[in-house]
């Protein structure tokens, strides 16, 4: 035992040694607490007591002070500013691979041999009792070995004794038993030897032997007395094999732009026919650029003057290459279009030969691949235009003109492919002026516009000379081809090519024609190159080929052919404008297109006719083109329509013929609809286009027509004694427009089928202010009560007043007068709808559109809102039998009259008619006994006369009917068709015993004469029926009044849950008081009425 030492005296030698256990009792306790067996861990408990003791040991000083900077007059916060350039710029891109230092890796190499077979292994086992069976070298300086021992006894231990310094010191490693390795005779144990960095060096040697301890004795295995030796060696990295660089072929090195090689035996000069075939324009064509020194050498050998030609066209070829790249970009975008591109056909032999020659000259420098066909034609035509302008006047106004436009497009590079609508493609052509005589206003050449709409207008304005010479012939071609287009899309492409060939021949050969005639072929040639949908604008007839080819609709070439577009196309704006702006060369023939949306609520034919006249005979009116923008928001679909208006002096004779045809087609029928049918509703309104008559010297004043439109709907069955109805009044604006002031028309459409349970749908068009008639009279007398409710009255009636401010776009160009903005509210009366309610006034208001059109003009656009019916059927339509089942069914009479302009160009009035209303039974127990059928007639004079509605007395006249008198004009002067729609509404579930008390509607008589239209109706209501209606109305009102209280109670509960009880109770009491006060006001207003 070593002598005892003091606890504080620890020498340098025994610094890392374990202290002597016999030094003192205190040290003994500390050692026992510090050194504990690893197999008996005891959890250390961190109680609160130890932490408290630790904090209690910390001395506290009561004399410490805390002072703040603000008490000393300093600021609490000190800010130090650093300049950004003083900060060192530290890059965030850390290359960890370069920073990591590479350490040398060492491995253990064995210097012993293992048993090669199991027999040798068993022989050694019988002698040595333990043998190293296998050794596995792990990554790094580690080795894992397997020891096979002879199963002598059950209890056994295997050690591996190793030494690093030739057995001066050694370590024993306990080997672990390998599970499930016992085969009855032998067992397996595993061990692992690893070298750490102090001993990990080159040439380090590890020696080990095996000691096998059993109950029978201890056995050693040392590799026959030589021990098992492992040598530490540095791991050698095998160099990565460097792949040899493959030499590229000399041809590939010389020609960097070379894509494919071409044999030298290929003839350098192809025949002219083959070269002309390369001009064919295909969708999937990709130009190939091949340029190599070998090919240039061959080319120079065959053509000694190649260098001279290259020097001559060096600058030109650079420009052509830029144009080709831009053209390729545009072509790749245009390949997405659904229209196939046709072959470019040249009609002039001399021109074709010049193109071939120019094509050969272009390809002399880049000969090994053809240029883009569109580029070849474009460049040749452009060069012909520059060099041969004086010698070829036909080409001057023909193809070079169009190619200049395409060249401008190629240089500016606009995005022209795959847009949602073709009319929105704004070609950047306005900024650059054409190179022909466009600057000369005397020639009247067409100006380049920024959109298809303006281009069509420009092509049609300056078209007078072309109309006189070849207009009718071109019309025949285009009209015939457009008819073929409607049948098949495949045949349409061929027809386009035919039309192009014929028209290009006429254009190129017609030298003396107006340049505007040839200006239109620009768009045809351009569309042929660029893959646009073909639009025939030759002559003065514009066919809607784009819309028909896209929608596959049939256009009948009769007087008023209509293309219905239930699913609006994106090309509608351009197509409708192109069609409508054409002049009608053949009387009685016109192709019309209607891009506007119609309500798909009817399964019968829809009718809408749009006509416009365009005449460019007077150069003063060429600047009178006004673009009117209208937004049609029907069923959340908007379509923009740009319009141009011009004078109508040339077409008054044709309109007179249209007048006769309208008189012939005015035969109509009275329609009776079943409850399952849908009432036709016009979801859009049409404006009356008025064009200028300034060139005729006629100064006329126009006054807007004021008309009342009343619609009522009754529904009843033979077994139900109740009826419910709807009354709608629309008042048209009354404005006075001067000679230079456009007339402003506001159009409002109502959607009343929100909340309706039946299949009836109504729409009210052409109204600035729409109100609902409320007749609260309980007397039996029959009287008229046509009124426009004020806003405060509607609030008392629990109604909603909706104001749609309208915005007028001021068109102050070319001398057109300004238009002031008029905001007129569209009032919609909304009533409560119940299962037993008699009045259904739940109306949805569609956005109100406003169209500005030119005053002093002809009425050209006519809208028909329903089916054409017979004028003679009016009395029978309004005479209802009291014994018939449909006596309470509503009869809606709508009429739009049109007066065609005679040859002297006078303005005629266009008016809207009113609707007849039949007695209804309301939720509030008031009955409009009879209502007015009003009709505003057209007048063959200069001033629009507003029709007057004569009202009978409120209570003085019993059984008296309303009389509508017209100042002037007669019904015969109106050329528009009449419309009658008759529809019974859904049945109400009431007892059939109430049939006896049913109010009997008298026969409504309509007198059609030259002076006016008279409608009268009378009915009687029994006192018992009124009382029954009152009880039912009170019951429904009381039911409705309980709903807000219940909702307020729920709000009260939620308030109490989230907030205080007193706050929720106060809110609830206040709400109850407010509801009671509002209910009292409503009762008082009802009593006053």
From Swiss-Prot:
Subcellular location: Membrane
Gene Ontology CC terms, in alphabetical order: membrane
Biological processes per GO annotation: glycogen metabolic process
Topology relative to the membrane: Single-pass membrane protein
Bias (Basic and acidic residues): 602-614
Keyword Transmembrane recorded: yes
Every CBM21 domain range: 123-231
Residue stretches of biased makeup (Low complexity): 37-51
Keywords of the record: Carbohydrate metabolism, Glycogen metabolism, Membrane, Phosphoprotein, Transmembrane, Transmembrane helix
Tissue-wise expression: Skeletal muscle and heart.
Record's comment on post-translational modification: Phosphorylation at Ser-48 by ISPK stimulates the dephosphorylation of glycogen synthase and phosphorylase kinase.
Region (Disordered): 32-57, 385-420, 479-501, 566-649, 949-968
Motif (PP1-binding motif): 64-67
Superkingdom of the source species: Eukaryota
Modified sites of kind Phosphothreonine: 58
Subunit and interaction comment: Interacts with PPP1CC catalytic subunit of PP1, and associates with glycogen.
Comment block on domains: The CBM21 domain is known to be involved in the localization to glycogen and is characteristic of some regulatory subunit of phosphatase complexes.
Role of this protein: Seems to act as a glycogen-targeting subunit for PP1. PP1 is essential for cell division, and participates in the regulation of glycogen metabolism, muscle contractility and protein synthesis. Plays an important role in glycogen synthesis but is not essential for insulin activation of glycogen synthase.
Protein's name in the database: Protein phosphatase 1 regulatory subunit 3A
Organism, as annotated: Mus musculus
